[in-house]
Amino acid sequence: MTDLTRFAPALLESDMVYFKLGARCTPLRGAWLARVPGLEHLAAGCILVDVDMLQIESDRENWLETTTQTLETLGCPRIRLYLYDTSPELPSALETQGFQSRCEIGFLGKPCASRPDCSVTLHQVETDADWKAKPQLYHGITGPTFGYQGPPDDWVALERRKSSIGPMKTFVIQLDQTRCGSVSTIEVGTFLRVKSLFLRPEWQGKGIGLQVMNLMGHLAYQLEKDAFGIFAVAGSAAEKLYTRAGLLPLTQQHEWNKPLSR
């Protein structure tokens, strides 16, 4: 029986892989800054990755000050990073500096050999026509799409850039000929990361998300992966969905975010 706990590090690492795809990575003291040129205003377009916890813990106040100044000089709209396995002192320092945080729960599942009985299908977004049509999925929707505001055209441009140069694939979720939403995957060794599951409001609560996660389990098997996983914001509908899908909550990380003056 596969011990899913050992894939928790792969799930955490998959976020760093995602943020680096299509990004310009600049070394800073204690971290790297991953920026996607022209799309820095998106949350995933400007973020600190590969944070060196030892450097931060030993000099956290000065690190926060100098890093904030550097990002402001570069014109970054925010300072955003993920932390886990840290002492209480650093989160306290971040809160004092005006950072907001949220907990993301990491769910892991086992590949499934049998193809699930599903009414939905996944169409990979590959051609120029596919990408040009994809922003229509988000039109008419008010509020954040993936937890953050962002123009649909820009979000799709970010997806396209990341999908064009690495192990990431993006799919449109279809029911018959109707497009209901989208989802992406990233291959990280023997692990399959599921990313950015989105359903239009009129298709939520109809069991489509559960079918998609079942398809992800079978896709992981087809790709000969040992496990697959995804993150959900604590207390969100996604957390309930992944629990219903049989995935196990086996790790977590905390996102820290602070807008910067420009």
Predicted regions and their residues:
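A conserved beta-strand-loop-helix scaffold within acyl/acetyltransferase catalytic domains
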Residues: 150-200
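Conserved acetyl-CoA-binding loop-helix of GNAT-fold acetyltransferases
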Residues: 59-68, 199, 205-220, 244
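Short amphipathic alpha-helix that is part of the acyltransferase structural core
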Residues: 1-14, 46-49, 54, 105, ...
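Conserved active-site alpha-helix within GNAT-family acetyltransferase domains
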Residues: 87-101, 206, 210, 234-252
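Conserved GNAT acetyl-CoA-binding A-motif
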Residues: 74-83, 220-233
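Acyl-donor-binding surface of acyltransferase catalytic domains
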Residues: 56-133, 256-258
